[in-house]
Amino acid sequence: MLKKEDRAMGYVENIEELIEGLKFDENGLIPCVVQQHDTGEVLMVAWMNRESIKLTVETKTTWFWSRSRHELWNKGAISGNIQQVIELYSDCDNDTLLAKVDSPGPACHTGSRTCFFNKLV
């Protein structure tokens, strides 16, 4: 059982229970919006499965499921720009996640700080 101060630090007592309340798509995936915790800047959107959520909660770093490579990946593990998870939320329908992170460098594979740089309107 976790102590009160552990819960206040964001530790999760039962990861399975947390995951069971989420709504995954037919492929077992759920979208996750990644946001810089202190500025509110939206950095990227990626997909998570049950295992990547567990790893994210356990390691306090972002883990995602690559739909193209069909494998788990720890964001920033290769570039060194590992995203530290500050908070993780689900939306009102429990079908989308929001990870508030501290992202030390570019979040986009193009080298841009954010993946959202193609202004449409």
List each language-model region with its residue ranges:
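C-terminal binding/interaction regions
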Residues: 2-29, 36-43, 48-121
